[in-house]
Amino acid sequence: MGVTSYTLETTTPVAPTRLFKALVVDSDNLIPKLMPQVKNIEAEGDGSIKKMTFVEGSPIKYLKHKIHVVDDKNLVTKYSMIEGDVLGDKLESISYDLKFEAHGNGGCVCKSIAEYHTKGDYVLKDEDHNEGKKQGMELFKIVEAYLLANPSVYA
């Protein structure tokens, strides 16, 4: 098993606490409202496992995440994708560390690290990561636009 890491920093005019609440704390409710391809997000067991189910006809059927850390004080979350079509037969899991920090005039910089844990001797290709990054940025931009259009939400 190998591990390949990627880092990304994204800036936004949205305050870090608002973005954290939207993308982490209330994502189970907000994401299905903003993204029609997401049917629902359900917590399993004690809530540390979250299953995101996509609508019929979507290229992805479901994703399952294990939540390791949600730190409201430091605006940090850590979780891993542990099941789903995205992993295929080449990935064991993908771990994510996200930190939301104040930046500029009330804005935020979101710092993320993605670690791809591969199966066997598979070597991750940049295009594999780039597809995931593209989808993650799409979600980020949709939530950002919603928060900018609705300044009282999560304020």
From Swiss-Prot:
Belongs to the BetVI family. It comes from the Eukaryota. Keywords: Pathogenesis-related protein, Plant defense. Gene3D superfamilies: 3.30.530.20. This is Pathogenesis-related protein STH-21. One of its GO terms (molecular function) is signaling receptor activity. GO terms for biological process: abscisic acid-activated signaling pathway; defense response. Induction: By wounding and fungal elicitor. One of its GO terms (cellular component) is nucleus. InterPro entries: Bet_v_I/MLP, Bet_v_I_allergen, Plant_def-hormone_signal, START-like_dom_sf. The keyword Zinc does not apply. It comes from Solanum tuberosum (Potato).
